[in-house]
């Protein structure tokens, strides 16, 4: 990890310009004696003397007056101002027409609201943020919510990015004050100001916002921006937050809608104002609730910008050593002396840097970090049965209880496989091969399509996963392996998790505080892996994308341990499901199956390891697997795409849409997805509209709009496993193909299949037996010709390929064929008669093509054509056309009839 000291320049005025000195120059020395007259010698008396500067002395520098540090208003004593805007898309579709700006000022529980209307809905008629804030604050003072002008305020909105830049000149005034965060906007520092501009490489001083009230008195505002969407559980909508806070969002009456708000304003201005102001009230009350939670429940000094940030702060507060906690994550403090040009003595700075031993293995640990296991094990509908959706309770939260401080200096290499087993931080690079009958291999291989789980290959993984693979009978060869021992048995996250569990129990289930605490606990482990894999975000100030920086908790060893144990746990559970039971899919920490809970063996070593961790935070906790949902019939389309066909009474439908957007007005979205799947056709398109990205908005000064587009619908299987055993299943009166799967032999096999399936599905869908035969025919053709010098034609079938190659053998008189047997015209007529339209010119021109042997796959189509050819040309060695592996089977098929 590279540590820089650029921060120093921001706060010390240190720059290369300060190193230049201004002294007495040579030209000044000459001019100091005056100018000699060229016409006659000059005497000393005639010389006009000038004051001579003191030699070898620099002019005195003006003493810089240090700006006094401003005493800020304590965070929880600042007024909260929530902003919301209502707008509709312009007729030309290039900008938003702003209809109104509404503000809610909240201070010490008292509330003041105001709605402001622009003179025009054109861009030129937009109101400026500073003018709006003045009116909102003055209205709050009139309403006796504020008794004086504030200096520090909190400005918030639900989805701040959508509202903040609807003000006049917002891009020029605000782009250096805020930064993109999870595709929205939050403050870049504690207050509204400017920081070091990375593009111009120069310092920009922080500047507050200066405003004038109606009496022309000047006031200075220091603003901290918050996006309350980043502080809502699961990024909930404003309506959902309103329900949690018991502030219902005003419904838009028919026939109006969110896209016809201008008509709503014109027809019912009072109802429009109520609707608009309520949105700002919900946002203000939401921030008030989060603020109270941070102050009273977590004892924080301020409100972090995201729930993940709240989790980190709460976690640090749960530790005994709050100042040196980064030592638990493999950091040490390093001091360095620097000497700024404007100081009379050196300055000592301290930074946290990774310890040397951690850096030695950091890249290896990062390679061992992967995400969750996500696979579909079927393609198509299930039979009618009882299909259960099981989840591992508090999966990642419980696993973090296994994390202890690592003794990086004592890490060691090993070639002993069993040395990697057990509750250790063990990392390995291995080659593996599972037995052929293995249903669910447990070692992940990374690909451009995500993680796949083949029967053989090589991968970086953890000791937990190797333990499961070994118990499945896999042959494992260690290429490199390391064990990093625990320094002690103190569980880093245990106090935090126990505290969070107790807090959740103290709140009403389903309440705002309970949901917020739950997400806070679940988001903490995600910080362990932040920025381990390159991920860019658009930097608003710099104007380009740059890699997301690590969090203070980022640690590749902990991230690998946590996700590796989760994958191992799911792998062991899947392996212990009886062979006569079907598994539909697995998603991160749960799976869909028709097996009952008592039929799944949960006594394996990994299950026991997780059980011990889970019961550390909940000693009275139940089993390590629990039922969440249930259905009678499902469709498993692909990874993360499962739809409920027939529901089970008392359960919500199981639905994962697999990136397909459904109009929110559709009430039964599961039924919609089922119908969409059953009626799909090649070339179908779905809505692929997206919101204007930050890059486009800030570089082109565009409004946040819905960029409309259509994309090709993709509901086909993702080929992460090999399809087999097709049957037709009835689904709501329609028949649809259903397929089982088995693991691919290798990553290469999966990539080979996926590439060709993606090409095939451009003009096909997999819905019935004809589709299945078409796809299988195309796949075996690709396999047979992959190392041959032959190019497949579009929509060419295996028998058409065989006919094309057969003509070459005739033209070259090879394999027992002779032109004396039959003329080209006669052969063309015969080929046409048996169903392969051929011209005599094609027969003759086949001489120009090279002979290719062993390129024809064995299919029903090619066997039938082989019989016809042999009956016409008994001396022809038809086997020469087929790949060598299938020739014995071909002879059996030809002799069987």
What is each stretch, according to the model?
Residues 231, 237-341, 570, 589:
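Acidic, Mg2+-coordinating catalytic module of metal-dependent nucleases/exonucleases
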Residues 2-81, 85:
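N-terminal accessory regions of nucleic-acid-interacting proteins
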Residues 57-79, 144-148, 214-216, 366-388, ...:
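A short acidic-Thr-Gly-centered motif at the start of a beta-strand
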Residues 74-106:
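Gly/Thr-rich phosphate-binding beta-strand-loop-beta motif of the actin/hexokinase/Hsp70
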Residues 111-259, 275-278, 282:
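Conserved DEDDh/DEDDy metal-dependent 3′-5′ exonuclease domain
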Residues 291-379, 438, 463-467, 477-576, ...:
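C-terminal, non-catalytic extensions of nucleic-acid polymerases
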Residues 279, 389-394, 521, 580-596:
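Catalytic palm active-site di-aspartate
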Residues 228, 234-235, 374-534:
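Catalytic nucleotidyl-transfer cores of nucleotide-processing enzymes
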């Amino acid at each position: 990890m590279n540590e820089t000291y650029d921060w120093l320049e921001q706060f010390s005025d240190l720059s290369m310009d300060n190193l230049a000195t201004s002294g007495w120059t040579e030209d000044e020395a000459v001019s100091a004696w005056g100018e000699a007259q060229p016409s006659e010698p000059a005497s000393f008396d005639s010389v006009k003397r000038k004051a001579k500067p003191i030699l070898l002395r620099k002019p005195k520098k003006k003493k810089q007056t240090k700006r006094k540090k401003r005493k800020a208003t304590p965070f929880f004593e600042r007024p909260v101002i929530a902003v919301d805007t209502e707008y509709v898309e312009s007729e030309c579709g290039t900008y938003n027409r702003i209809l109104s700006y509404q503000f809610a000022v909240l201070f010490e529980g008292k509330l003041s609201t105001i709605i402001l209307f622009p003179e025009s809905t054109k861009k030129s008629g937009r109101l400026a943020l500073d003018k709006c804030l003045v009116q909102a604050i003055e209205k709050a003072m009139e309403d006796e919510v504020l008794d004086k002008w504030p200096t520090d305020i909190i400005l918030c909105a639900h989805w701040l990015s959508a509202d903040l830049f609807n003000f006049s000149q917002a891009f020029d005034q605000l782009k250096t004050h805020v930064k993109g965060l999870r595709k929205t906007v939050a403050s870049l520092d504690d207050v509204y100001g400017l920081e070091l501009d990375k593009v111009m490489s120069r310092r920009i001083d922080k500047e507050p916002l200066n405003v004038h009230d109606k009496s022309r008195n000047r006031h200075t505002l220091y603003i901290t921006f918050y996006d309350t969407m980043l502080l809502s559980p699961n990024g909930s909508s404003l309506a959902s937050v309103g329900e949690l806070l018991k502030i219902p969002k005003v419904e838009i009456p028919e026939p109006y809608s969110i896209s016809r708000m201008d008509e709503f304003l014109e027809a019912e201005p009072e109802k429009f104002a109520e609707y608009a102001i309520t949105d700002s009230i919900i946002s203000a009350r939401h921030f008030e609730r989060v603020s109270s939670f941070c102050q009273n429940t977590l004892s924080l000094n301020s409100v972090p910008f995201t729930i993940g940030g709240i989790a980190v702060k709460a976690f640090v507060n749960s530790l005994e050593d709050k100042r040196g906690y980064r030592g638990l994550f493999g950091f040490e403090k390093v001091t360095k002396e620097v000497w700024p040009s404007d100081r009379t003595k050196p300055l000592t700075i301290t930074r946290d840097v990774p310890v040397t031993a951690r850096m030695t293995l950091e890249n290896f640990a990062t390679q061992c970090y992967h995400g969750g296991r996500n696979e579909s094990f079927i393609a198509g509908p299930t039979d009618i049965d009882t299909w259960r959706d099981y989840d591992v309770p508090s999966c990642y939260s419980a696993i973090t209880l296994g994390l202890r401080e690592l003794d990086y200096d004592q890490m060691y290499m090993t070639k002993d496989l069993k040395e990697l087993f057990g509750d250790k931080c063990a990392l390995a690079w291995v080659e593996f091969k599972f037995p052929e009958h293995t249903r669910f291999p447990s070692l992940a291989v990374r690909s451009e399509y995500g993680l796949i789980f083949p029967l053989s290959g090589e991968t970086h993984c953890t000791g937990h996963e190797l333990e499961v693979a070994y118990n499945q009978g896999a042959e494992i060869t260690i290429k490199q392996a390391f064990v990093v021992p625990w320094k002690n048995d103190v569980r880093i996250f245990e106090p935090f998790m126990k505290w969070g569990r107790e807090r959740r129990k103290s709140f009403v289930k389903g309440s705002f505080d309970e949901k917020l605490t739950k997400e806070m606990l679940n988001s903490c482990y995600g910080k362990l892996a932040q920025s381990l894999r390159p991920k860019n975000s658009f930097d608003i100030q710099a104007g380009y994308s740059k890699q997301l920086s690590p969090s203070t908790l980022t640690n590749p060893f902990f991230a690998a341990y946590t996700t590796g144990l989760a994958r191992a746990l799911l792998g062991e559970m899947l392996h212990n499901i009886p062979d006569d039971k079907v598994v539909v899919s697995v998603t991160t920490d749960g799976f869909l199956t028709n097996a009952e809970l008592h039929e799944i063996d949960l006594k394996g070593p990994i299950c026991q390891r997780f059980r011990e961790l889970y019961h550390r935070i909940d000693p009275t906790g139940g089993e390590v697997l629990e039922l969440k949902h249930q259905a009678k019939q499902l469709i498993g389309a692909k990874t993360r795409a499962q739809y409920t066909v027939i529901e089970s009474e008392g359960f919500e439908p199981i639905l994962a849409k697999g990136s397909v957007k459904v109009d929110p007005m559709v009430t039964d979205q599961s039924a919609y997805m089922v119908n969409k799947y059953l009626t799909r056709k090649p070339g179908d398109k779905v809505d692929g509209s997206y919101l204007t990205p930050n890059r486009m908005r800030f570089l082109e000064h565009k409004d946040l709009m819905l960029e409309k587009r259509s994309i090709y619908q993709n509901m086909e299987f993702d080929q992460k496993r090999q399809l087999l055993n097709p049957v037709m299943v009835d689904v709501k009166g329609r028949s649809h193909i259903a397929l089982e799967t088995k693991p691919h032999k290798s990553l290469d096999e999966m990539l080979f299949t996926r590439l060709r399936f993606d090409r095939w599905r451009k003009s096909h869908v997999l819905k019935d037996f004809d589709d299945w035969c078409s796809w299988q025919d195309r796949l075996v053709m690709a396999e047979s010709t992959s190392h041959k010098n032959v190019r497949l034609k579009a929509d060419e079938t295996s028998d058409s390929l065989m006919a094309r190659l057969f003509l070459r053998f005739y033209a070259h008189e090879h394999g027992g064929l002779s032109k004396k047997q039959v003329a080209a015209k006669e052969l063309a007529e015969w080929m046409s008669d048996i169903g392969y339209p051929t011209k005599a010119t094609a027969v003759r021109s086949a001489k120009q093509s090279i002979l290719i042997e062993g390129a024809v796959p064995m299919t029903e189509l090619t066997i039938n054509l082989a019989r016809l050819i042999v009956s016409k040309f008994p001396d022809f060695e038809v086997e020469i056309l087929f790949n060598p592996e299938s020739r014995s089977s071909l002879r059996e098929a030809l002799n069987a009839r």
